[in-house]
Amino acid sequence: MTELKLNPYFGEYGGMYVPQILVPALKQLETAFVEAQQDESFIAEFTDLLKNYAGRPTALTLTRNLSPNPLVKIYLKREDLLHGGAHKTNQVLGQALLAKRMGKKEIIAETGAGQHGVATALACALLGLKCKVYMGAKDIERQSPNVFRMKLMGAEVIPVTSGSSTLKDACNEAMRDWSASYDKAHYLLGTAAGPHPFPTIVREFQRMIGEETKKQILEKEGRLPDAVIACVGGGSNAIGMFADFIDEPSVELIGVEPAGKGIDTPMHGAPLKHGKTGIFFGMKSPLMQNSDGQIEESYSVSAGLDFPSVGPQHAHLNAIGRARYESATDDEALEMFQTLARCEGIIPALESAHALAYAVRMAKEATKETILVVNLSGRGDKDIFTVADILEAKQKQQESGNE
């Protein structure tokens, strides 16, 4: 069997911790990716789809009313304007093209919030691939509009009832299916995590976010931003934003994990700052686990950040101090969801609202002229019913408290 062409590790994190049966499939994927990156016709087709189907480049918008401090400009990288509604579409198109290049006829995917499932379904419809999406039964209930979208575009949505019936269980089932079908199917992983070469592939197919941002901010401001800020679940939108800035020491890289109901409670999803290194989902990375080493449930109001681990490159950037990772609570994200809608007429995804919350916190404390760029990773249409229910429940609670 061929040797690996790329380094599977980021410092001590990453690797390829999978059953032996999957190693040939991962090596085949790595080879196809390396060759595709050097193939002008592949790059041309990917670039064409990004431009003429997905709608790149996306805008870099200076907020008019969001910044609480006259010294601070807050820009939004508008991945919410991408076809499909979120940054997910970028790398899904890249991986679907890779699958076709390898002669695969079928795509297997997992999804939590349904955004990755929708992106996978649209890419499969466009490129004529059969599509199977594994989704936790709980998430199917929480995200019915996205389930319908996937089915409408021809995907088969398979409910997962094992474990906690959420994303980590869907990941396990998708991986199990792929083990039995990798000769004809490609597993289209939805984030910059999992076994090598997925973290590298996903980063490279998302890195145009940061590349465009750099070019756009230089045109608008004549200098680089002081910080780029992105929410972190598995970490694909954040690594897409960070990748082109890693070698720019003047730019601070800030990832925002979900603090849920509070970091001091068990109800959060912040493994980078509060987890222990372990093996999960084919990689070595920080993990939320109990004292017996069992994986603990992560929690976040946003289904897309509800993941008990994190991509290995983020773990490495954190370990070497190149990026710093903060957190925002459910309440802060809900507040920012409403604030951006009222201040700017933009409804952000609950995931992205975590990054916005930290940016506004940072802006309040600034004492000199500062430029912040927030990756607005997706739009909030998928979240309006969730938020409406939460706000209604809060209002009822207040009213009963006032009586």
UniProtKB/Swiss-Prot annotation:
It comes from Shewanella frigidimarina (strain NCIMB 400). Keywords: Amino-acid biosynthesis, Aromatic amino acid biosynthesis, Lyase, Pyridoxal phosphate, Tryptophan biosynthesis. It comes from the Bacteria. This is Tryptophan synthase beta chain. InterPro entries: Trp_synth_b_CS, Trp_synth_beta, Trp_synth_beta/beta-like, TrpB-like_PALP, TrpB-like_PALP_sf. Tetramer of two alpha and two beta chains. The beta subunit is responsible for the synthesis of L-tryptophan from indole and L-serine. Pathway: Amino-acid biosynthesis; L-tryptophan biosynthesis; L-tryptophan from chorismate: step 5/5. Its EC number is 4.2.1.20. The lineage of its organism: Bacteria, Pseudomonadati, Pseudomonadota, Gammaproteobacteria, Alteromonadales. Disulfide bonds: none annotated.
